UniProtKB/Swiss-Prot annotation:
Miscellaneous remark of the record: Only isoforms with 7 transmembrane topology (isoform 1, isoform 3 and isoform 4) are transported into the plasma membrane in transfected cells, while the truncated ones retain intracellular compartments.
GO annotations of cellular component type: cytoplasm; plasma membrane
Primary role: G-protein coupled receptor for neuropeptide S (NPS). Promotes mobilization of intracellular Ca(2+) stores. Inhibits cell growth in response to NPS binding. Involved in pathogenesis of asthma and other IgE-mediated diseases.
Protein name, as recorded: Neuropeptide S receptor
Protein source organism: Homo sapiens (Human)
Keywords assigned: Asthma, Cell membrane, Cytoplasm, Disulfide bond, G-protein coupled receptor, Glycoprotein, Membrane, Receptor, Transducer, Transmembrane, Transmembrane helix
UniProt-listed SUPFAM superfamilies: Family A G protein-coupled receptor-like
Cystine residue pairs: C121-C197
Name of the coding gene: NPSR1
GO biological process: eating behavior; negative regulation of defecation; negative regulation of eating behavior; neuropeptide signaling pathway; positive regulation of ERK1 and ERK2 cascade; positive regulation of release of sequestered calcium ion into cytosol; righting reflex
Length: 371
């Protein structure tokens, strides 16, 4: 969905917005242009057409190629951990984002108008919003899974179905919360002659409650849950790292403390937590400007200037960047935490007591938590 949702007409001076409060039919024309200081800048879909097409094509290629590499990498793994399962789910979501959201936007920017039938308009908008929710809720599921892995490790090992249940819930909520999109959006003719797949509001005032609800469901509530989960995880790791020093000091070299094996955290799990946190930070960096701009814009807190219109064009493409960045993060972390067995055997004789202890812990886990 575009960052700038304004559809009302501006007066000639560009100082205010004149809205018709009476209900309109789905086919009524509306203005879809920005007027800044008396100059018309055109619609979002025609402005900076070449620049937007180049940007979207680059994002599309990086998204599809990058996530294809991730999916191939996880498919080749003989031992698939729960972390690998979530990485796969995230890559699938990002791949569909590239095919449905980015590729559709490329076609839309190229034609300028929406040339498909009204039904296609509604379905495309619905799928775009589904992926919007899913990309966030998969991260929420990942944070809950990491919380159980660190805080309740023994229950975590016994609950193999939890990961799949979390993903099913994430996708189910995504499809459910996106249903209003089928009613809200439709194909309509704008007053400047363009035909767009746009909201069928009677006037712009409906955008404010709609975008507020979407922002909370897609961003603020999930981000709160994620922050709480990882806050507890980081605190647990810090406490157990202190316990580690006490346990090691009471163990003579060559012995393994069973209490350590049961209670402390492997390097692989900590690496997985670091990967997860970086993924979350990338999500925040790409999506925060989008929702912040939309909220300020819909509450009329931004000036009607040329700069605001330029910002809306740039910010609109930031969410797509998230799907292109995630595979790069995976590649960085996977190369640093995946060790061939041959190298482990050659280094076995040079292992310290701490390294032998951690290796023993990994052997007693039914599914080691590496990416």
């Amino acid at each position: 969905m575009p960052a700038n949702f304004t559809e009302g007409s501006f007066d000639s001076s560009g100082t205010g917005q004149t809205l018709d409060s009476s209900p309109v039919a789905c086919t009524e024309t509306v203005t879809f242009t920005e007027v800044v200081e008396g100059k018309e800048w055109g619609s979002f879909y025609y402005s900076f057409k070449t620049e937007q097409l180049i940007t979207l094509w680059v994002l599309f290629v990086f998204t599809i190629v990058g996530n294809s590499v991730v999916l191939f990498s996880t498919w080749r793994r003989k031992k698939k951990s729960r972390m690998t399962f979530f990485v796969t789910q995230l890559a699938i979501t990002d791949s569909f984002t590239g095919l449905v959201n980015i590729l559709t936007d490329i076609n839309w920017r190229f034609t300028g108008d929406f040339t498909a039938p009204d039904l296609v308009c509604r379905v495309v908008r619905y799928l775009q919003v589904v992926l919007l929710y899913a990309s966030t809720y998969v991260l929420v599921s990942l944070s809950i899974d990491r919380y159980h892995a660190i805080v309740y490790p023994m229950k975590f090992l016994q609950g193999e179905k939890q990961a799949r249940v979390l993903i099913v819930i994430a996708w189910s909520l995504s499809f459910l919360f996106s249903i209003p999109t089928l009613i809200i959006f439709g194909k309509r003719t704008l007053s400047n002659g363009e035909v767009q797949c746009w909201a069928l509001w009677p006037d712009d005032s409906y955008w404010t409650p709609y975008m507020t609800i979407v922002a909370f469901l897609v961003y603020f509530i999930p981000l709160t849950i994620i922050s709480i989960m990882y806050g507890i995880v980081i605190r647990t790791i810090w406490i157990k790292s202190k316990t580690y020093e006490t346990v090691i000091s009471n163990c003579s070299d060559g012995k393994l403390c069973s209490s350590y094996n049961r209670g402390l955290i492997s390097k692989a799990k900590i690496k997985a937590i670091k990967y997860s946190i970086i993924i979350i930070l990338a999500f925040i960096c790409c999506w925060s400007p989008y929702f912040l701009f939309d909220i300020l814009d819909n509450f009329n807190l931004l000036p009607d200037t040329q700069e605001r219109f330029y910002a809306s064009v740039i910010i609109q493409n930031l969410p797509a960047l998230n799907s292109a960045i995630n595979p790069l993060i995976y590649c960085v972390f996977s190369s640093s935490i995946s060790f061939p067995c041959r190298e482990q055997r050659s280094q076995d004789s040079r292992m310290t007591f701490r390294e032998r202890t951690e290796r023993h812990e990994m052997q007693i886990l039914s599914k080691p938590e590496f990416i």
